[in-house]
From Swiss-Prot:
CDD domains cross-referenced by the UniProt entry: Anticodon_Ia_Ile_BEm, IleRS_core
PANTHER family membership: ISOLEUCINE--TRNA LIGASE, MITOCHONDRIAL, SOLEUCYL-TRNA SYNTHETASE
Species classification: Bacteria, Pseudomonadati, Pseudomonadota, Gammaproteobacteria, Alteromonadales
Reactions catalysed, as given in the entry: tRNA(Ile) + L-isoleucine + ATP = L-isoleucyl-tRNA(Ile) + AMP + diphosphate
Description of how the protein assembles with itself and partners: Monomer.
Similarity section: Belongs to the class-I aminoacyl-tRNA synthetase family. IleS type 1 subfamily.
Comment on bound cofactor: Binds 1 zinc ion per subunit.
Residues that coordinate or bind L-isoleucyl-5'-AMP: 564
Protein name: Isoleucine--tRNA ligase
Annotated source species: Shewanella baltica (strain OS195)
GO MF, one annotated term: zinc ion binding
Residues binding Zn(2+), per UniProt: 903, 906, 923, 926
Family matches, as PROSITE patterns: AA_TRNA_LIGASE_I
Short sequence motif named 'HIGH' region, residue ranges: 58-68
Comment field on protein domains: IleRS has two distinct active sites: one for aminoacylation and one for editing. The misactivated valine is translocated from the active site to the editing site, which sterically excludes the correctly activated isoleucine. The single editing site contains two valyl binding pockets, one specific for each substrate (Val-AMP or Val-tRNA(Ile)).
Length: 940
């Protein structure tokens, strides 16, 4: 064999079998950075149609987690695939840099502003801390293979962005959407600040649930409304609440106007009294009050009690009964304790009736000094004291511990309160913002489509947006308010532009350093500067304007796509929609795509306490970023995304199949020069033309899946192609031709040409997902080429050519099925030790007329398809008793060990081996390939 070994075309490549990704990827990243890869991509797309994916900014605090990785990888896949489709698709990453979490971190280090450090110095410390966090997160994102303008990202704390945020606010004001009001807002007593809807999480909490009696100021008159005359016992309305601490702020009792209410009399502890309860809740209420027998004295609609007065249970005033649409009979008594300073519904109905918006609670959650009974007590600690006082006043009918879902601060994880404070709001209904936003939602494509109904419900129900915060580190609300009238300065918009110009040069500190007289002159004494800062959701929500509209690489093009986790319907998607609609009357995006949260193999959230956290840094250091990227792409992101060590190991297995395919392709392109060796598709061997045709069809399916953001379909189709059409069929069949045919002959060059075309296409298919591996493949592909695959477009060399004489795709599919059946029988013969390898086998196929016609069409080349030394086709009726039935009714098989000698070069067993004098150990085909013009292949 030593004489003939060098006549074989053995595969050879520098592409290693093992990826060693954890070590090799950082080396590639260095080259990408050194070569300015991102700028090369930008230069390659000058003048092309833009596609703008706007990066929702992660918060600049802490290390990135697996959810961050999912988000950034999905964005990167889209950017790279859009670039492959010819778009100019810049990616400018961003960070959200203001707000409380950073303040808290800096406070731990230097103390609170105004104590050991000035507010100005505190802001500078916050800026430094945020910059450090950005640098750490940036390195982790780059390690994932995400390409972008990492050296010039947008930060909401950039002076230019801060200035543009102020300009965005001025446009909202100019459009008439801003107003100031005393309204109940979510308030965190730990933060000492209002919270946005998106900063509120709901967790279970145990609260005291109490039923409280409000005795009528005139019981006889109230009883009369039920048709009971001259009633002599006390009549009370009963409320049910889980926030006893709000009772000092009670200013009314709300009833539903069309609901039926009963007057129920009973005796307890020797005292006769009558209670007013919703008719449908009488039984459940009296059970709670341990009332064994009662009499219903009458019934009346809620509307009958409008403005009837009832005594507060422990304060020296009475309150009216009022009517509200928010009253339900889901729980409680059908009568709602109404404190306009502590609830949104309460506030709305209170405005209708002109009720006082009482707020006896300070910023820190402690009752103010003038609060009767409870001054100086924290509201949650005061609950027990309120209950005790009600019991003392004989107003408490029931008291139990009640477990329910309750709003918590997303940062402190502590319960929050509703508290009326003077704040700045974007009105949802003045100038039709809510209505227009709902119209814009309809014009936007939501992926998955359930996102539309989700955000619609949120917009329909959301209150006015409180955009002011009482914080130090944030973009200031740069307004001047008249000290007497509380009205905005009439030139607010132009003044804000002048302030924005200063911020552009000096940052937000310019506002606090500003002497009002510099802008207002003699008017300065009439006005005061607003010291509130903007909700950070306004910062990020205005970046479509403050960043996208401002940066040159976006060419003034609107945003095509927002892509974030599903929690952002109420977060960034919402804030961006509101600001854009308020500013421009339209949504800031055309498409909105959401992905699910990551959970472990048991469906649980990632939690340090559970110990199921999978850090992306650990994955890249152990398996490599391409494995993580493949997991992201292969997972249907429309629901929860399950990840575990086992799942990532499965991704690594899938990766190896793709890598092995790429290695086979490269190894068999050794010595192939496309410029001189490429065989035209129409001149190829039929099997080669078929596989190119299959690849061309697959490419269209892959491109379509990329365009629809169905990356799991891309990976499914890629794996199917690598495993079935290539791995189990085509690549197996061509090995013989590739290794043994004449090196320069048509049979081999046809095969190599097909492999080359597939390689050129496949390296592009995988580039958006397996970016590092694609680059590795690209560097080793033969032929002249640009430095990087990422500047390319989808390969145009895949021609779907079908000649008149060609065999159909169905034919090759049938042949694949037959081959699988043959393999089963050969495998059994191998287990029975009747043969060794498949080339020791002679197979006889007993087939019906239709299948016989197909199998004999390719003549002697059938044996190459079946990987046997001989293949005979005989009529099914002639099947011998030893013939094995197959899953095809039209086919039976007999496998026998060949009696012919084995060719030393190709290992086929052929009758002529030993008959050729010059080459006694070779078959005729090998002699032709060594000394002649090379064998001729038509089909396989």
């Amino acid at each position: 064999m030593s004489d003939y070994k060098f006549t074989l075309n053995l595969p050879e490549t520098e592409f290693p079998m093992r990826g060693n990704l954890a070590n090799r990827e950082p080396e590639m990243l260095e080259r990408w950075t050194k070569d300015g890869l991102y700028q090369q991509i930008r230069d390659s797309r000058i003048g092309r149609t833009p596609f703008i994916l706007h990066d929702g900014p992660p918060y600049a605090n802490g290390s990135i987690h697996i959810g961050h990785s999912v988000n950034k990888i999905l964005k990167d896949i889209i950017i790279k695939s859009k670039t492959m489709s010819g778009f100019d698709a810049p990616y400018v990453p961003g960070w959200d840099c203001h707000g409380l979490p950073i303040e808290l971190k800096v406070e731990q280090k230097v103390g609170k502003p105004g104590q050991k450090i000035s507010a100005a110095e505190f802001r500078e410390e916050c800026r430094k801390y945020a910059a450090e966090q950005v640098n750490g997160q940036r390195e982790d994102f780059i390690r994932l293979g995400v390409l972008g303008d990492w050296q010039n990202p947008y930060l909401t704390m950039d002076f230019s962005t801060e200035a543009n945020i102020v300009r965005s606010l001025s446009k909202v004001i100019e459009s008439g959407h801003l107003h100031k009001g005393v309204k109940p807002v979510h308030w965190c007593t730990d933060c000492g600040s209002a919270l946005a809807e998106a900063e509120v999480e709901y967790e279970d909490k145990t609260s005291p649930a109490i039923d409280v009696a409000f005795v009528a100021a005139d019981s006889k008159a109230v009883a009369a409304k039920f048709g009971v005359s001259d009633y002599s016992h006390p009549v009370s309305m009963v409320i049910w609440t889980t926030t006893p601490w709000t009772l000092p702020a009670n200013r009314a009792l709300s009833l539903s106007p069309e609901l039926d209410y009963s007057l129920v009399e009973f005796e307890k502890d020797g005292v006769t009294q009558a209670l007013i309860l919703a008719e449908v809740l009488v039984e459940s209420c009296l059970t709670r009050y341990n009332v064994e027998s009662h009499t219903v004295l009458g019934s009346a609609k809620g509307a009958a009690f409008e403005l009837v007065r009832f005594n507060h249970p422990f304060l020296d005033f009475d309150v009216p009964a009022i009517l509200g649409d928010h009253v339900t009979t889901d729980a409680g008594t059908g009568i709602v304790h109404t404190a306009p300073g502590h609830g949104q519904d309460d506030f709305v109905v209170g405005q209708k009736y002109g009720l006082e918006v009482a707020n006896p609670v300070g910023d820190n959650g402690v009752y103010k000094p003038d609060t009767e009974y409870f001054a100086g007590q924290h509201v949650f600690k005061a609950n027990d004291n309120v209950v005790a006082l009600l019991r003392e006043k004989s107003a408490l009918l029931n008291h139990v511990a009640y477990r329910h879902s309750y709003p918590h601060c997303w940062r402190h994880k502590t319960p929050i309160i509703f508290r009326a404070t003077p704040q700045w709001f974007i009105s949802m209904d003045n100038h039709g913002l809510r209505t227009q936003a709902l119209k814009e939602i309809e014009q936007t494509q939501w992926i998955p489509d359930w996102g539309q109904s989700r955000i619609e419900k949120m917009v329909e129900n959301r209150p006015d947006w409180c955009i002011s915060r009482q914080r130090t580190w944030g973009v200031p609300i740069t307004l001047f308010v008249n000290r007497e009238t509380e009205e905005l300065h009439p030139d607010s918009v132009s003044l804000m532009e002048r302030v924005a110009c200063r911020i552009e040069q000096q940052g937000i500190q310019a506002w606090w350093d500003l002497d009002a007289a510099e802008l207002l002159g003699d008017e300065a004494e009439q006005y005061r500067k607003v010291t509130d800062t903007l909700d950070v959701w306004f910062d990020s929500g205005s970046t479509f304007s403050s960043v996208v509209a401002a940066r040159p690489e976006f060419h003034g093009h609107g945003v095509d796509l927002y892509l974030e986790g599903s929690d952002q319907h109420r977060g960034w998607f919402m804030s961006s929609l509101m600001i854009s609609t308020a500013m421009n009357g339209k949504a800031p995006y055309k498409q909105v795509l959401t992905h699910g949260f990551t959970v472990d193999g048991k469906g649980r959230k990632m939690s340090k306490s559970i110990g199921n956290v999978i850090a992306p840094q650990t994955v890249t250091n152990k398996l490599g970023a391409d494995i993580l990227r493949l997991w992201v792409a292969a997972t249907d992101y429309s629901g929860e995304m399950t990840v575990s060590d086992e799942i990532l190991n499965r991704s690594a297995d899938a990766y190896r199949r793709i890598r092995n395919t790429a290695r086979f392709l490269l190894a068999n392109l050794n010595g192939f020069e496309p410029a001189k060796d490429l065989v035209a598709v129409e001149d190829m061997v039929a099997l080669d033309r078929w596989v190119v045709r299959r690849a061309a069809a697959l490419q269209q399916e892959i491109i379509e899946a990329y365009e629809q953001y169905n990356f799991h379909i891309v990976t499914q189709k890629l794996m199917q192609f690598c495993s079935v059409e290539l791995g189990s069929f085509y690549l197996d069949i061509i090995k013989d031709r590739q290794y043994t045919a004449k090196q320069e002959g048509h049979a081999r060059r046809s095969c190599q040409s097909a492999l080359y075309l597939i390689s050129e296409a496949m390296v592009r298919w995988i580039a958006p997902i397996l970016s590092f591996t694609a680059d590795e493949v690209w560097q080793l592909l033969p032929g002249e080429r640009d430095a990087y695959v990422f500047t390319q477009e989808w390969y145009q060399g895949l021609k779907s050519v079908t000649l008149a004489t060609d065999l159909s795709d169905d034919y090759w599919q049938q042949l694949l099925t037959v081959r699988n059946e043959v393999n089963k029988v050969i495998e059994q013969a191998r287990r029975d030790k009747r043969i060794g390898g498949s080339l020791e086998a002679e197979v006889t196929l007993f087939a019906d007329a239709a299948l016989t016609e197909q199998l004999t069409h390719i003549g002697d080349e059938l044996r190459f398809v079946l990987l046997t030394s001989e293949a005979k086709v005989l009529p099914l009726a002639d099947a011998t008793s030893e013939a094995v039935e197959t899953e095809l009714a039209s086919l039976k098989l007999v496998v026998a060990s060949s009696t012919a000698e084995k060719c030393e070069r190709c290992w086929h067993h052929r009758e002529e081996v030993g008959t050729i004098e010059a080459h006694p150990t070779l078959c005729t085909r090998c002699v032709t390939n060594i000394e002649g013009d090379g064998e001729v292949r038509l089909f396989a």
